[in-house]
Amino acid sequence: REARSAAAIANPHIVQVYDTGEFDGLDYLVMEYVHGVNLRYEMNQQGTFSVRETLRIIGETLDGLASAHRAGVVHRDIKPENILLNDRGHVQITDFGLAKTVSQATLSSTGILLGTAAYLAPEMIEKNQATPQGDLYSVGIMAWEMLAGNVPFTSDNPVTLVFKHVHEDVPSIATACKGINEGVAAFLAHLTARAVEARPADASVALT
């Protein structure tokens, strides 16, 4: 269903889904080919990003998500691996409709979801509640990592990691990046607020 909904979203910052269907009992997606790399690759190459470049990439990500949220589609698995940077350096979000709701039971599988767990919103962890605000939380964690060079919560154990997201506030980016603009710090704090209602309602609101 999400894949079909994603196919109807026309936005330059979303990888286009051209067709969905079933063949020999298997579901398939026909998607746009993007020539480029994912954000994780760039993070590994650069270590950290300037505030200007971070805000550009985050802004393009939010623009893509705004179209999705208006169409009633929530991504549920925003992380650097799912943010593609095309050969012009622009964002294209991938894996709409491929992301599955994660339950606490699957989170306990050692190591499997460590990459995803670092970006999961508290309500996703506690209630399997997929919301536009959950996407924004993940975007905020990603921005935090781009500026600081690491995510705010770390652990080798995914269960410990998700416990931190549920029970601890995300530290201000100012604790990791001394002298950072107060407006940028406030913006990230808004995106990563622990309570759903304390975040912007959706990506369109976050952009205003």
Language-model segments: which ranges?
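Protein kinase catalytic-loop region centered on the HRD/HxD motif
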Residues: 62-73
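AlphaC helix of the eukaryotic protein kinase fold
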Residues: 1-8
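C-terminal lobe helix-coil module of Hanks-type protein kinase domains
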Residues: 118-208
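Activation loop
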Residues: 106-118, 125
